Amino acid sequence: MKSMIEARPGIFSLYRGMRLTVVAVGLLSLPLLAAAQDLTQLYGEHGVSPLAVRQGILGTCFFHASIAEVAKVAPDALKGDILPNPGGGYRVHFSQGPEEIVFPEDVEYGRIHSYDRSEGTWVLVLMRGYAQRVLRLSLVKAINQSTLIPFFVKPLALSWLDQSGPLLVAYDRAIRSVVKQDGELDKAGLKLKLGDELNLIGIPAEQAKELAGFLDEKGFFDAVALTVRQNGEVFGAYKTLGQGQIPVRVIEAFMGNADAGLVSDRKGVLEQLRRLHAGGVALVAGTKLSVPDPAFETENKSWWVPTHAYSVLDYDEAAATVTLRNPWGGRPGPDGIFTLPLAVFYQGYEGYSDSR
């Protein structure tokens, strides 16, 4: 899944420090709002809507295109998924499982590092909550499947993971601080940083030691590492391989049931496009890595980005056209929205994910 950096090399100069210096030129001069925006403002001019969603410098098109779709289909429900947390910050509600806590400092971190450029902070709050959710699911699975973690220790770990609380915040922060640009993790570095973060959020030292020690158990660290590799961008990895970041998981997290298919299945994709037009369905489509016709990229350069996720906004069966939106909020300008003949959609797109 493409970030703006990968698609247009030379536009951005990156520095992996506490702050990120960005130089923008040309048609894609998209202002980063980290410094100017009030971090206490959840919603901007467009509220919870696709037009408010704008991807940051990471390759999170799979997340931003999906959130834009959910915002189109169920804006009130998505707005209701962000709740105030009594201890500060927010709680993010999902279709299943515990709520995730997102603190103001984690929202600020995301803005400083340009994880997101959306209006307000609601998309970034959902993004941090989603990152914690995918971690939680992988950790629960790893603990349940482990034959080496002592039976008397498992209940402690599962009890922490079965409730909304700061444990996943600590994991999220620790991973963000040590993840490499390709999504890889160093076990020793993660264990050390996780211990620090667990202590900082107030988990007793003995329990913090046990929880960090799980990373030494066979299969446990592997589960964490795989989750980060598959969802590396939401943890701050600038250049992952695009493996596993599928929109169906994001749609599923916020809307319940979701499925995926291939655009080459003409009958299947037409059925979903008709459902989309009828209303109530979220649909995200991903472009191919390449197309056999060399002229295609030239003829469609105003919007074409390979292996990139787009929100599908509408389908006009009479005109045989599909309307989509680039989560960059541009290309094409001014808002990333464009309409394609159905034949061009078939030629340029590989797969889709939809709510059920």
Whereabouts are the PLM-identified features?
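Sec/Tat signal peptide C-region and signal peptidase I cleavage site
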Residues: 32-36
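Bacterial N-terminal signal peptides that target proteins for export
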Residues: 4-22
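Bacterial N-terminal signal peptides
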Residues: 19-31
